[in-house]
């Protein structure tokens, strides 16, 4: 790696670390008792096929400021929103980690671009989890138990599920952006949201092979309320 590339990466690392530190400082006061994921209605459901999954995660209506917040079981205020985001990041990271393990065992992904996507996004999603956990500190919610079925061992199912999960992440972050009070939290959320959008675009292109896969919902993103996100995630059956 040349010196310019090293410098750029160092700058990015410093920005990420600073955002996480700033966000963590906003949690210094008060305490939050977190409920279990089941209280949020996340557990249960059956694993569905890629087409049905994508259909379940299509955008709903836009939301206004102060509406569509996560259930109280995630925590109060900004803590609840970041724990809501962390739950989605846990899900995504676990999905890609399992797919990576299966890829090492069976080489189920044959397409070279999809292999690169898996490697890159696995790193990113684990970084997002670490980032949010550091920002939340002792208030971070625990990782849920998951079951991805065959979606992490079939190339076609993997790509379809990646499209669904990444687009849901984008809709979830945009849905909560106006609900965040702390500037440090807004910076943290936006730094992840933009990367999730890039993941979704690449996954969509891998799935369709057409430019339309990059922006499946058109030129504007439609925010999801927390309830819409949780309903869509529950339908996947991935969270146990």
Regions found by a protein language model. Give the residues of each.
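N-terminal secretory signal peptides and thylakoid transit peptides that target proteins
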Residues: 25-48
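All-alpha RGS (Regulator of G-protein Signaling) helical domain and cognate RGS-like helical scaffolds
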Residues: 2-32, 55-240
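Short, glycine/alanine-rich hydrophobic alpha-helices that insert into or span membranes
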Residues: 46-56
């Amino acid at each position: 790696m040349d010196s310019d590339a090293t410098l750029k990466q160092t700058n990015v690392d410093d920005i990420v670390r600073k955002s996480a530190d700033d966000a963590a400082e906003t949690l210094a006061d008060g305490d939050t008792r977190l409920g279990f994921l089941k209280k949020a209605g996340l557990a249960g459901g059956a694993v569905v096929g890629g087409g049905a999954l994508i259909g379940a995660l299509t955008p709903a209506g836009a939301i206004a400021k102060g509406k569509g917040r996560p259930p109280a079981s995630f925590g109060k205020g900004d803590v609840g929103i970041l724990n809501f985001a962390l739950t989605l990041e846990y899900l995504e990271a676990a999905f890609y980690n399992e797919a990576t393990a299966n890829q090492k065992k069976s080489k189920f992904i044959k397409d070279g671009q999809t292999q690169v996507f898996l490697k890159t996004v696995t790193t990113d999603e684990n970084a997002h989890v670490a980032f949010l956990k550091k920002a939340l500190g002792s208030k971070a919610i625990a990782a849920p138990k998951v079951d991805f079925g065959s979606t992490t061992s079939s190339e076609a199912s993997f790509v379809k599920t990646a499209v669904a999960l990444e687009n849901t992440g984008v809709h979830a972050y945009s849905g909560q952006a106006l609900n965040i009070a702390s500037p440090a939290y807004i910076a943290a959320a936006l730094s992840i949201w933009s990367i999730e959008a890039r993941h979704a675009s690449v996954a969509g292109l891998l799935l369709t092979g057409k430019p339309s896969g990059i922006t499946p919902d058109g030129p504007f993103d439609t925010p999801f309320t927390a309830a819409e996100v949780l309903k869509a995630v529950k339908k996947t059956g991935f969270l146990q």
